[in-house]
Amino acid sequence: MNIMMVQNISFLSLHLLLILLLCLRPLTTVADGNSTNIDGWCDKTPYPYPCKRYFIKHSGFRLPTQISEFRVLLVEAAMDRAVSAWDKLTNSSKNCTDFKKQAVLADCINLYGDTVMQLNRTLQGVSSKTGRRCTDFDAQTWLSTALTNTETCRRGSSDLNVSDFTTPIVSNTKISHLISNCLAVNGALLTAGKNDSTTGDSKGFPTWVSRKERRLLQLQSVRANLVVAKDGSGHFKTVQAAIDVAGRRKVTSGRFVIYVKRGIYQENLNVRLNNDNIMLVGDGMRYTIITGGRSVKGGYTTYSSATAGIEGLHFIAKGIAFQNTAGPAKGQAVALRSSSDLSIFYRCSIEGYQDTLMVHSQRQFYRECYIYGTVDFIFGNAAVVFQNCIILPRLPLKGQANVITAQGRTDLFQNTGISIHNSIIIPAPDLKPVVRSVKTYMGRPWMMYSRTVVLKTYIDSVVSPVGWSPWTKGSTYGLDTLFYAEYKNIGPASSTRWRVRWKGFHVLSKASDASAFSVGKFIAGTAWLPGSGIPFTSEL
């Protein structure tokens, strides 16, 4: 089966949703109210103008009487514009002959398709017509992902040194501003209601998790549905072939386990949208290795350079190494990219140089993993916790500094960030002999509201005494608006005496403040990690 056929199968349900929404757009309004009465509501948002402009053009809406009704209107508006943007990008790709632009458009079509799905998921979750099926915290996660997707699309052009041609295509939709308005309004409801991120039923499961999925999450032992083996002793010789079979399931609510026997698998994996509940089990991170060599200098966007790209919900990987062997001279080269909500990586090794691990979006948990890299080697805009992990800066190019994290929060209301808890930061073997000659920092602000915390972690002398770095030397970008924090760390470089003195840097002294970034609170882990068979600590 060729790549295009696989993509067509993987995206079939997404295309059906988008076509349906395109057809139904004129029917989504009801004959009540008028645009002038909405101005007061729009004035409460961060971006009143695109809000008012949208409702002037779509004047058949029902005037909201409370903020929850206004939220539904905003999400409907954002979804309408996202569908329009996806349609424009798809049409543009039909006439595009430039190889680099084709690569950027392929990413953008996928990302905007996911944005539509996240907005639709939010709408179904918060609408009174369907009955509340999610918490405000869930909605904030999905809205955060929708906004992250638009930013990832925009940045693809700069990766390949082509002019930003995607922004003009979608500019009249004002989609990013409309999603930011959704985040602000939903965020207000989240704060006002003190909505607990772990809200669920009496057994701790989120209300949107079905009974079948609850049984699935409670399974302690698993049997492989398919076996992959290089020597031909399994069902397939490649991991992607097994993933493609899983993607053809009519029902994806049951866990699909793929056992990958020891071996080096030179391939690029894609677990696409709607290919949910995949579990990859290897023979250990030293024995089951998935490796690739794509890079930005090799003609790929950062997003598409990933050796493994994970999008389907509830993905689990256990005992596997993900490598990108492009090398430090090739620039951005991702080993693992996850956009999978409620995804788990246990006892995995993620190995690369620049941009090793793209924690792109959604809620993610990494336990007892090894992560190797040089520049910005943990980056993205997920809500992610690394617990009991070992983080290993490697030897970079001459003159380069190592930066462990580059968190990508673009909106103050996004509930995203990187939390490193009870972990170890030490030099990789290739850096150790020359560790004094290379500066290493725990993070720098990729975006305006970058958020990273390091909690109860051993910090070796590999880390510079100042701890953190500006985006570039002398830059003040994000230094007042970021949130970087440390809490009860240990080790030679754990002292905060010589740390940066930015407005956005904090030394936390109260457990109550630090606990906001625990597994239980930051990613609602107590609602979906129990019963997975993966150990975790919910509090600090």
UniProtKB/Swiss-Prot annotation:
Expressed in siliques. It is an enzyme of class 3 (hydrolase). Glycans are attached at residues 34, 91, 95, 120, 161, 195. Its EC number is 3.1.1.11. Pathway: Glycan metabolism; pectin degradation; 2-dehydro-3-deoxy-D-gluconate from pectin: step 1/5. Coiled coil: none annotated. In the N-terminal section; belongs to the PMEI family. This is Probable pectinesterase/pectinesterase inhibitor 60. It comes from Arabidopsis thaliana.
